[in-house]
Amino acid sequence: MFTFSPSFMFDFELTRILGSASSGGCDVGEFKSALNTIKKNDPESWYAAWKQQAERAQKIADEAAKAGYRVLARNAYLRASNYFRATSYMFNNDDARVIPFTDKSIACFKRATELMDGEVLSVDIPYEDGITLPGYLFLPPQYARVPGKIPVVMYAAGADSTKEELYFLYGGTGPQLGYAILCLEGPGQGLLLKKNKIPLRPDFEVVAAKVLDFLDDLSRSQPALELDLGRIAMAGAATGGYFALRAATDPRIKACVSIDPFFSLWELSLTRVPQAFFKLWDSGWVPDGTFDAFTDRHARGNFQAGWEINLGKSSMGVEKATGMFRRFKQFTLEPEDGTKILDKVTCPVFITGPGSGQEMYASADDSTFKIQRLLTKVPDSKKEIWVPNDVADGGLTAKIGAWALLAQKTFEFLDKHFEVKRKEL
């Protein structure tokens, strides 16, 4: 298969950027210019390449806005936002450049939302201890409305995505199909992690409950929005797919879209480490200090492993690999207390997996099919599974490179279960 980079990780992330082109997140010429200067496993060359393209796109956007070209300015601001997101992506979260470029990505995106066809609400959702969860509520323009009130999709970020990037899957497409899309960042995601150092939490149903309460309050205070709280779906990809299943235990969620989720983060980690050594540590035969030293040495010699370990420690709120792996045990659909999370899910579920054998993380055999079997409270008529092989069909993790097709399959599923009727064109 053709690759953009000899680095598996760089190739995946480049495909991720180019894959957003169908929704306005990338231009092929800008992509090729950036690609020309990126070196294998060299984060500085990645940074320089995307910084150049981000600043270029922002300049084009500013010029288009000054000239009164709404659509052209919007499109360029969207690309600039995505490129600024990519700029610092390969750095650890403690790098001084991460927050400034995240802020630039947000600023360009917010400028783009001012130029969109439908109304976009920038929201702050009350969470706990005075903390709010940031998000965008994309509303359908009047010409795209479907009969009745507006169905809602709550779309959660994953381990490394941002609420701005989420636009390029459902945020752009959903409103054009009559759906309201709430793209949000929870604890351990986006600036809540990078700036506030708030880690991920495994019981995402708690987070989802706060978001659902917010939607209820918003609907009561602004009835003119016509949000249909009887038709709320939850969606997420990879780690977000796990979060979507946890959120679906709330009866207010009426449909769940879980894209390439993991079943257990601990079990997933076992597929990516020397298992004999790992099990010796887990059983107490290898001291923490020895295990941490080994992991640190491995991280220094392997760029992808180092990046993943640093993100893992950051998102788990710990300083050592041993603490990270212990926290991984909490991120599961079958916690150690014996609770069977999936027994609490009764709504229709659309679940996907990567079938190409090129999965970045969770495989379909270890996660997707297992989850399908354990969703015993969901009738077969309300369970849909999609595990494509070819990259064009969504064979890569999180359906990278096939977001347009994923969006089509998602809204076909939601239309069916939310009884949205459309006319054949």
From Swiss-Prot:
EC category name: hydrolase
Biochemical pathway: Mycotoxin biosynthesis
Annotated catalytic residues: D366
Pfam families attached to this UniProt entry: FrsA-like
Record EC number: 3.7.1.-
Cited InterPro entries: AB_hydrolase_fold, FrsA-like, FrsA_esterase
Keywords on record: Hydrolase
PANTHER family xrefs: ALPHA_BETA HYDROLASE PSOB, DIENELACTONE HYDROLASE DOMAIN-CONTAINING PROTEIN-RELATED
Record family assignment: Belongs to the AB hydrolase superfamily. FUS2 hydrolase family.
Subunit field text: Homodimer.
Function: Alpha/beta hydrolase; part of the gene cluster that mediates the biosynthesis of xenoacremones such as xenoacremone A, a compound that shows inhibitory activity toward the PI3K/AKT signaling pathway and which has the ability to induce apoptosis of A549 lung cancer cells. Within the pathway, cooperation of the hybrid PKS-NRPS xenE and the trans-acting enoyl reductase xenG is responsible for the formation of the reduced tyrosine-nonaketide derivative. The alpha/beta hydrolase xenA then accelerates intramolecular nucleophilic attack to give a pyrrolidone derivative.
Name this protein carries in UniProt: Alpha/beta hydrolase xenA
